Amino acid sequence: GSYDLSAHTVWLGDRTRQPDGAHVEFARHVRNPIGVKVGPSMKPEELITLLDTVNPHVQKGHVTLITRYGESKVKDLLPEHIKAVQNSKHAKAVIWCCDPMHGNTVTSPSDPKLKTRMFSAVVSELTSCLQIHASLGSVMGGVHLELTGDEGVTECMGGSMELSDEDLKRCYLTHCDPRLNYEQSLDIAFLISDVLKSQRRGIPVNNALSQALLRSNRVEGNP
C-alpha cells in the first residue's frame, strides 16, 4: 500500500464508514493509521465488519477506535462495542480513544445559534470510559479533545472558571465546534494525570477517579 501524504491519521465517520463506500475503499489501501468514529449508530457487528475490511491483516496499532456517545449513552453502548472487539481477532490490535466532546454538544439556552458543551458532561463521559474499560479488562489508550491555549475563550460552560451561559458571547471565536479554553483544558489534563499516577501506584480506577475528582473539586473551590 501507499501513504496518504495529506494527513497523518485518516478517519472514517458515521457518514463515511459504509463498507461498500468510497471512503472505506480508500482507507483499506493506505498505510496511514486509520481512525474510526464509534458512536450510538454503530452496531457491534458493523464495527467488526469494518475492522475486517480496513485491517484484514490485524496489524497492531493500525486502527484507533474513537468512541463518542454522549454522557447519557456511554454506559449502555461502550461495553457492547468493547465486548464485540474482545471476541474478535482484533482484540489486541486496536487502540481505544475516548472523544468526550462531540457527543455532548448542545445549543446555548439563550442563543440557539451558539453551540456549546458542558465541562461536567465532558468529564462525565471521560470518567465513564475509564471505568468501563477497566471493568472489562480493556485499556483506554487516548483522549480526543478540542481545545485552545487561549485563556480568554468562552465557548464551553463550567470548569474551574465556572463559565455560565451568560459568559459565552464574551469571547466566542470558533467557526466550527466549541473548544475547551486554557484553564478547562488543564482541568482535564490534571484529572487524567492524577488517575494515571494513582493507577501506577496500584490504586483501582474507581478509587483513583474518586480521589482525582475530589482534588479537582477542591481546586475549583467547591466544598
Where are these regions (language model features)?
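Active-site-facing alpha/beta catalytic cores
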Residues: 1-71, 113-120, 124-128, 132, ...
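Short acidic/histidine-rich active-site segments
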Residues: 95-103
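A translation/RNA-centric and nucleic-acid-associated enzymatic feature enriched
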Residues: 83, 94-95
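Generic detector of intrinsically disordered, low-complexity, polar/charged segments
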Residues: 100, 138-139
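Helix C-cap/helix->beta junction micro-motif
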Residues: 30, 90-92, 136
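Short, structured loop/turn "capping" segments at alpha-beta junctions
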Residues: 60-61, 92-94
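C-terminal structural cap/anchor segments
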Residues: 105, 109-114
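A short, acidic, amphipathic alpha-helical segment used as a generic capping/interface helix at domain edges
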Residues: 76-88, 123-134
